Amino acid sequence: VERSDKMYGGTCINIGCIPTKTLVHQAKIASGMKDSTFEERSAFYRNAIAVKESVTSALRGKNYHNLADHPNVTVYTGVGSFVSADVVSVRTSTEEIWLTSKQIIINTGAETIIPPIEGVADNSLVYTSTSIMELTDLPRRLVIVGGGYIGLEFASMYASFGSQVTVLESYPELIAREDRDIAASVKETLEKKGIVFRMNAKVQSVKHVENRAVVVFSDSQTGEVFELEADAVLLATGRRPNTKDLNLEVAGVETDARGAIIVDEYLKTTNPNIRAVGDVKGGLQFTYISLDDYRIIREDLFGDKERKTSDRNPVAYSVFIDPPLARIGLNEDEARKQNLDVIIKKLPVMAIPRAKTLGETDGLLKAVIDKNTGKIVGCMLFAPDASEVINIVAMAMKTGQDYTFLRDFIFTHPSMSEALNDLFS
């Protein structure tokens, strides 16, 4: 059961990973158009949106037919909600159907949080991370409300396309969950792209004045009020589990304070015959976590029942700014708060031969090593190809390798992965 014919394949394929990373790649190309006019950049951006749509529609169609063409699968496009613990009502465009099952899986994903800012509702110049990717005209001035990972990805992308980007972040520090040296390197690198950061920014209203938006915000430290004009405003203020219309109460399925479905390590809800997978259960909102959720349920239903959520930690993640930021495990601050005796290793990207050949020398590599065991506790890579290289570190950690395994491993040359030799030396 899927409520939208535009969402087969889920968030990743349609409005998340695939379209954004397609645009990130196109933006990387656009960043080389140094002497181009804004009109030329706008034309390139318009084509990039078309490329994105081609990629997503092809994958959406493939995912739909993988289901619809299977002899054991019936697909309903409609809105589902629980009638009881084992009955789901599906309202299609033409009828209401009741489906009964002893095993039900909830996979409704997450939705964008729209903050209660005056002037945001029904404002045609205000976008979410979903709707802005349908915008075919490159905004000359883009204001992004929120400096988290989603906000930074779009800031980096649109700055590369040629927009003047301002990020309004309510906190005094950028990406507070990262170490300050990593966050400082990210901020400095993005500022080189022309991105402006306004910290301690509390957005009060967004006005639609003629053909432009006027964002009114104050500095939460000083109280001073500012106005910014923009051609588009992006709300990057987080996502929340999509549970509000499911009528979970009648099914005996409980949620936490954030609306996420509560599950055990086998993904069973408070009703053991109903499971929840993906973003709707809270936690890390990554496609590869959803895929591993499937593996857990597969093993629970048809296998040895040994696979569980606690087996997969730590999990790596990447933020596709330019260059990418990737991380796995504990950072330095977290390790020290846990009173771990750690060794900290750092390597500036400018010291990496492959980075020099690419002409991309901004960034920083950092590793956290347990001094007593020699095991890698965590790793942060802000560098070209970081989203690929982090998987090497992840495999070393998951297989229990000593840090010397990466220090002495024979990598190809020149490559970004060989920087691990120097980082762990």
Per-region residue spans from a language model:
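FAD-binding beta-loop-beta segment adjacent to the flavin cofactor pocket
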Residues: 112, 252, 259-273, 326, ...
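Glycine-rich dinucleotide-binding loop and its adjacent helix/turn
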Residues: 17, 108-168, 193-197, 249-251, ...
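Glycine-rich flavin
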Residues: 3-138, 166, 171-175, 181-182, ...
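Core beta-strand elements of the Rossmann-like FAD/NAD(P) dinucleotide-binding domain
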Residues: 94-103, 223-232, 270-271
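FAD-site-proximal beta/loop scaffold in flavoenzymes
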Residues: 122-139, 227-305
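Flexible, glycine-rich terminal cap/loop adjacent to redox cofactors
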Residues: 1-6, 11-13, 18, 22-23, ...
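General small-molecule cofactor/ligand-binding pocket signal
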Residues: 74-76, 127, 196-198, 275, ...
